[in-house]
Amino acid sequence: RQPYLLCGHLDRVVNFNGDKYVMDQKTTTSTPGAHYFNQYEPNNQMSLYTIASQVIFGSPIRGVIIDVAQVAVGFSRFIRGFTYRTPDQTEEWLKDLRYWLRLAEGYATEGYWPQNDTACDKFGGCRFREVCSKSPHVREQFLKSSFEKREPWNPLKAR
């Protein structure tokens, strides 16, 4: 069994009002009010940013500053929001991560990955939706004809 390595790229880390924060930039076409910022509590990306920053810098991170650019026809608007994680929340997130990793290990051992059909329409829709909607015995053919196999993304490579 190999150890897991969580990795990615932080946009930046800043000092703000005497505290250390991770900063993230987002764009949206909708109005970024309270409802918009609610999507970041809870949120895997923001929780992991908090945890990773604390590991990397060896000191507490107060939270994540989310700078949002609303892009619309004829105007742009910029809004700043904040999200915070308590030590209990980060511990719970890590516990949940261990659970999901064990589950994924079981899928890998079985050689079977069940569909998560509640996520097909998220974030503009899954690229594999057309394949998954086919009968299981023809999916491999659709994969080969509609997709190109590439080298997996490696976040350890410099951008």
Where do the PLM segments sit?
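Metal-dependent nuclease catalytic regions and adjoining charged, substrate-binding loops involved
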Residues: 2, 38-41, 50-159
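Non-catalytic protein-protein interaction segments used by genome-maintenance enzymes to assemble
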Residues: 1-46, 50, 54
